[in-house]
């Protein structure tokens, strides 16, 4: 079955986006699938301002463990986060910066609580580069300007969702994995969403929504 058939029970594309935005406003997570001909993988996404230790623990337990903080260009520049590598030749051009850790309020930086502290420190509107140590256990990602209309990636989808929901622009994502360590595809993502009461939507849904309502985001 393709994504459209699998996601039909979550409503039409516009409904799926609106349900996801409401869930984020309520402090719940959502599951975002990218295109079937891209990765066809699903990420858990949470807003930074509502992020809890329990939510972080779920991401560490059920996902790849590579917890990423999605930032706008402006936020990444404010923190003076350089690219992880000078020459990014990864297949999907994922814009990793150097990894980070909060300088205050953490121990080893690995625990759920420590990662939440690092993320909230970095996403604070008044954050300074000196608030963070490098390297660390949180992986910032720099979203491309134009969001999903410019790049159909989970990074851009995360930042777009936060802005569309009227929340702080920064969001957190982690790729969902199966119990055997393989990557969760659409059927497993749908089952995961039902189990954890998380709306499921796609990058394509977001592109349609932004185009339909002519949404201009930062």
Curated annotation (Swiss-Prot):
Listed Pfam families: DHBP_synthase (PF00926)
Cofactor note as given: Binds 2 divalent metal cations per subunit. Magnesium or manganese.
Gene behind this protein: ribB
Domain of life: Bacteria
SUPFAM superfamilies assigned to the protein according to its UniProt record, in alphabetical order: YrdC/RibB
Residues at which Mg(2+) 2 binds: 39, 154
Name of the protein described by the UniProt record: 3,4-dihydroxy-2-butanone 4-phosphate synthase
GO biological process: riboflavin biosynthetic process
Binding positions (D-ribulose 5-phosphate): 38-39, 43, 151-155, 175
PANTHER family: 3,4-DIHYDROXY-2-BUTANONE 4-PHOSPHATE SYNTHASE (PTHR21327:SF38), GTP CYCLOHYDROLASE II-RELATED (PTHR21327)
